[in-house]
Amino acid sequence: MSEDRQGRSGDSNKILYCSFCGKSQHEVRKLIAGPSVFICDECVELCNDIIREELEEKAQSARSSLPKPREILEVLDQYVIGQLRAKRTLAVAVYNHYKRIESRSKNDDVELAKSNILLVGPTGSGKTLLAETLARLLNVPFTIADATTLTEAGYVGEDVENIIQKLLQKCDYDVEKAQQGIVYIDEIDKISRKSENPSITRDVSGEGVQQALLKLIEGTVASVPPQGGRKHPQQEFLQVDTKNILFICGGAFAGLDKVIQQRSNDAGGIGFGVKVKSSERKQEVGKILAEVEPEDLIKFGLIPEFVGRLPVVATLEELDEPALIKILTEPKNAITKQFKKLFDMEGVELEFRADALSAIAKKALKRKTGARGLRTIVESVLLDTMYELPSQENVSKVVVDESVIEHKSEPYLIYQAQPAPAKAASGD
């Protein structure tokens, strides 16, 4: 019966029917044949509508789940102390980036350009932590690459495509997830070219790497070896489109402040006023870096094309003593909170006195390691205590004061009061 109803495509006498809605070939405009089935143009249109609605729902869901700039800033504040201007710049840039991805799914006339980010700031000012916190908040794959290990293709070292392979590893080789991830390239200032003039000889770890990164950052389809890499050469390469991957580049850019000052002084002309202006401009490095222009980055050694691919520039200030003390105590994952938890697991309370926190901050400033050096200092002063404590009994509290930091004294151990032994009852 059903065979008579559907007919056969080779039998011109049989009337053909849509396998989905049951309409005959005479009731619809077009009937498309498949292996033993037929579908009419009306059912095709209905399927398109269903898919379109599902995609719209998906887009709306993504839009509602994307945190707004103010919400992004609130989360960054929980983990990163200070750097308000940089955090605001990042919050807006990231929000606009993921809105841009959403707009690409629609057929809009206006195509939004990609806005990768350059973070400029001293060592230990929070560049890497900002990028990590953003990725965690947005729940997207995140990887960190070291620019100093990269070389041009064909030379000893890592190819730039290795960055995308690391990103794929973070999301278990899910290409779709990786294509919306975040890549942080650290030490980007270390690949500046050696002189302002284009190099005659090959600069495989400087200008050459910048050239290799251009397409990757702007948006290209990168061919990446699948899981297992060279062990399975017969496998096809994975094609990863980088146009929706957000690239954040960071570096200390030591000496950039002098380039900025020189430009400002040159702009002031010549004469007696220049000397006065120069002395007035003895400011903090962070404030000088905030005035950075693309021409300063080019003079520093980044090629113009590379600077053009990083339109959003956020500068971070050098952390002072009060900021370092806050970093020690205030963030959700503050260093002192982490060590207090470790000691608490031994049933011991850990106390850092105010003078100890100040001494730790001063030592980090002296070493010029910023926030990154705080953990090293705390770890070193508590090492012996953490070694001995599990074997000791009745310790209730460990106190760290200034003398422990400055003079390498042992932390104070406070023991639980032992109950007095019970007196033997005297016989009558």
From Swiss-Prot:
Chain ranges of the ClpX-type ZB domain: 6-59
One Pfam family linked to the record: AAA_2
Binding annotation for ATP: P122, T123, G124, S125, G126, K127, T128, L129
Keywords associated with the record: ATP-binding, Chaperone, Metal-binding, Nucleotide-binding, Zinc
Xref: InterPro entries: AAA+_ATPase (IPR003593), ATP-dep_Clp_protease_ClpX (IPR050052), ATPase_AAA_core (IPR003959), Clp_ATPase_C (IPR019489), Clp_protease_ATP-bd_su_ClpX (IPR004487), ClpX_bact (IPR046425), P-loop_NTPase (IPR027417), Znf_CppX_C4 (IPR010603)
CDD domains: RecA-like_ClpX
Keyword Ligase part of the UniProt annotation: no
A cellular-component GO term for this protein: HslUV protease complex
Residues involved in Zn(2+) binding: C18, C21, C40, C43
GO molecular function, one term: unfolded protein binding
Quaternary data: Component of the ClpX-ClpP complex. Forms a hexameric ring that, in the presence of ATP, binds to fourteen ClpP subunits assembled into a disk-like structure with a central cavity, resembling the structure of eukaryotic proteasomes.
PANTHER family per UniProt: ATP-DEPENDENT CLP PROTEASE ATP-BINDING SUBUNIT CLPX-LIKE, MITOCHONDRIAL, ATP-DEPENDENT CLP PROTEASE ATP-BINDING SUBUNIT CLPX-LIKE, MITOCHONDRIAL-RELATED
Function per UniProt: ATP-dependent specificity component of the Clp protease. It directs the protease to specific substrates. Can perform chaperone functions in the absence of ClpP.
Family indicated by similarity: Belongs to the ClpX chaperone family.
Name this polypeptide is given: ATP-dependent Clp protease ATP-binding subunit ClpX
The encoding gene: clpX
